[in-house]
Amino acid sequence: MALDLVDYEQKARDAVKAFWGNREAARQKQIESGKADQGERAGVTGGKNMDGFLALVLDVIKANGLAHAEIHQNRAMLTLPGYFRPTKLWDLLVIYKGELIAAIELKSHVGPSFSNNFNNRTEEAIGTAHDLWTAYREEAFGKQPRPFVGWLMMVEDAPESRRPVRDSSPHFPVFEEFKGASYLTRYDLLCQRLVQEQLYTTAAVIAAERSAVDTGNFTELSSMTSLKTFVSALAGHIAAEAARLG
């Protein structure tokens, strides 16, 4: 049976429009209430920004054989046990017949600050995955096949995220591919290496300008970290687990 990719490109464009629209709506609401956060924070604290991407992921799961699985989106049901910490809160969990089928993180990064936030996102992504796989090794989820672990990042496409960045490393040289790399390129390299090191089943990064609130246009950085690769891998895993578990 062919995998159903649920017209993911159109749904991704809708998700991009919703992302920027929700940020602006949250910012305007806080301004009107007189409780506006400083700078870009207002658009973040409103939440809901990645809901369009969440809906896309849900469609992939339901279209490829696990519409009847436990698909958790509510905060109270999104924790998994960790190894280095008691629990970790995920953005989406899929559980079927007592097995963890998928755990997915949906992240975004909007300017003007890219430096510190990039480092924080990197450390979080690596730590989260290492914690989960160590817990898996210790049978925190029982004896079962490896779950799908996905990481999807939406980054603002802006001059600040595309310009070359210099690094200071006085004792030992930085890896060549990082020298002068923009933050978008660094996210692409991060996602590639998260997959190469088997920390995530697949990791994707897309970039979109604020003007995409009207068009939904977005850019992908490489085939390995593309949205199609993410969606295809998820659809394949879901279909395989649906067939295995019946």
Swiss-Prot record:
Protein name: Type II restriction enzyme PaeR7I
Keywords: Endonuclease, Hydrolase, Magnesium, Nuclease, Plasmid, Restriction system
GO molecular-function terms, A-Z: DNA binding; type II site-specific deoxyribonuclease activity
The reaction(s) this protein catalyses: Endonucleolytic cleavage of DNA to give specific double-stranded fragments with terminal 5'-phosphates
UniProt keyword Nuclease present: yes
Family in the record: Belongs to the XhoI type II restriction endonuclease family.
Gene: paeR7IR
Pfam families, sorted: XhoI
The keyword Hydrolase belongs to this UniProt entry's keyword annotation: yes
GO BP, one annotated term: DNA restriction-modification system
Organism: Pseudomonas aeruginosa
Signal peptide: none
EC number(s) recorded for this UniProt protein: 3.1.21.4
